[in-house]
């Protein structure tokens, strides 16, 4: 192996409680927030359902799911994510975000572990001295599926 550090492409997304870093391959599209269809008897983080390319997607607030404040809907965007499970029940889901995401190239030595601030739903890390959360997507998806 040469001396160059390994690189990966990621998407840095702003939320109410900070920023999350997702693998580029999980983000299908970023769209403008539209008022979702209401759903009954769901947790507060389950905002509603929305239509996207023939699919009915759950729209969730990752911030509320992780104990932060709700994103305001002004300037809100929606990140459409491919579900890792790839099941037919939930092939995609949607996360509320703030503003436009940023594509980033990340060298392995730029990402430093901050495990003391990690939780059930995310790993915490430093990216160029900025705290970012890396969602535990399997756990997030499992939680969403429990409420479909």
What is each of the regions a protein language model found here?
Residues 1-148:
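An acidic, low-aromatic, low-complexity terminal/linker signal
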């Amino acid at each position: 192996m040469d001396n160059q550090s390994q690189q990966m492409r990621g998407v840095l997304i702003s939320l109410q409680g900070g920023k999350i870093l997702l693998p580029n391959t999980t983000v299908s599209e970023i769209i403008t927030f539209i008022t979702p269809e209401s759903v009954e008897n769901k947790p507060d983080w389950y905002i509603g359902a929305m239509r996207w390319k023939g699919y009915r997607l759950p729209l969730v607030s990752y911030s509320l799911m992780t104990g932060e404040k709700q994103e305001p809907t002004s300037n809100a965007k929606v990140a459409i994510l491919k579900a890792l499970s790839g099941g037919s029940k939930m092939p995609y889901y949607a996360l509320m975000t703030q503003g436009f995401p940023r594509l980033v190239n990340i060298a392995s030595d730029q990402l430093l572990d901050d495990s003391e601030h990690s939780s059930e739903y995310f790993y915490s890390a430093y990216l160029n001295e900025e705290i970012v959360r890396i969602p535990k997507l399997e756990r997030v998806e499992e939680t969403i599926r429990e409420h479909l």
